[in-house]
A protein has these predicted regions:
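Conserved glycine-rich Rossmann-like NAD(P)H-binding loop of the short-chain dehydrogenase/reductase
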Residues: 25-41
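Residue(s) in the substrate-gating loop at a strand-loop-helix junction
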Residues: 137
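Active-site helix of classical SDR
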Residues: 117, 153, 161
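Short, small/polar-rich loop/turn modules that mediate ligand/substrate recognition or access, typified
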Residues: 169, 174, 229-231
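Alpha-helical segment proximal to the catalytic Tyr-Lys
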Residues: 122, 166-167, 227
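Conserved glycine-rich cofactor-binding loop
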Residues: 11-13
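Substrate-binding pocket helix/loop in short-chain dehydrogenase/reductase
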Residues: 93-94, 98-106, 199
Length: 242
């Protein structure tokens, strides 16, 4: 298992569950979020007995990423695992979608994956070891109307995952993606019970996923058990894409 992990979008939901799962398996963790999340970091450190740090970062900004990741790598004394989880949605029909809604989703969901990966790469290459796990989405594989920006961003994350796996493999760095389906997060909690039931009825396992389901898949890909797995997209969707 990695011992020095960085997780973006870690203040809540899937990102927080990933940070907790990595900590539970013995990794020190840096939690990256737009405003920092000291309460969550402190709670993880207390529960699992690992070192945690948190830094505020706009993951769509090159300068912000460079600054935050330098602090993160210095605090950890290196980095052997990066989880690119930060993301937003701004759904809307193309005819009505504002330029900024398209641009902001691409910047936060796709550009950030490039920026954060680049920020850890020199350290991982020097160590000839690294685990990079990108959080994509079922919507990057099998999408729906009204998500042109989000679907494009997540499909891009999948393409970047595959390209980077080929580029970094000779340096001992694996790059994989996890593609969650309908996960029970703050976003889905805001849906009506009728809508949630409608989504659940489409899923072979007959329930929405939990953030912990995604976190366990990430932890597997970060572990030595997955040392010969790279360039892959693991669906965590209850069979929705079967």
């Amino acid at each position: 298992m990695p011992k020095k992990s960085i997780v973006t979008g870690a203040s809540r939901g899937i990102g927080l569950a990933i940070a907790r799962e990595l900590a539970a398996r013995g990794s020190d963790v840096v939690l990256i979020s737009r405003g920092g999340c000291p309460e969550q970091a402190e709670a993880i450190a207390k529960e699992f007995g690992v070192k945690t740090f948190t830094f505020a970062c706009d993951v769509s900004s090159s300068d912000s990423v460079k600054d935050a990741f330098k602090q993160a790598i210095d605090a950890l004394g290196g980095v052997d695992c990066l989880v690119n989880n930060a993301g937003i949605t701004r759904d809307g029909l193309v005819l009505r979608m504002k330029d900024e809604d398209f641009d902001n989703v691409i910047a936060t969901d796709l550009r950030s994956t490039f920026l954060c990966t680049r920020a850890v790469l020199r350290t991982m290459m020097g160590a000839r070891y690294g685990r990079i796990v990108n959080i994509a989405s079922l919507n990057g594989i099998r999408t729906q109307a009204g998500q042109a920006n989000y679907a494009a961003a997540k499909a891009g994350v999948i393409g970047m995952t595959k390209s980077n796996s080929m580029e970094f493999g000779s340096r001992g760095i694996t790059v994989n993606a996890v593609a969650p389906g309908f996960i029970d997060t703050d976003m889905t909690a805001a849906m009506s019970e009728e809508t949630r039931a409608k989504y659940a009825a489409q899923i072979p396992l007959a329930r929405l996923g939990k953030p912990e389901d995604v976190a366990k898949a990430v932890a597997f890909l970060a572990s030595d058990d997955a040392q010969y797995i790279t360039g892959q997209v693991i669906g965590v969707d209850g069979g929705l894409n079967a």
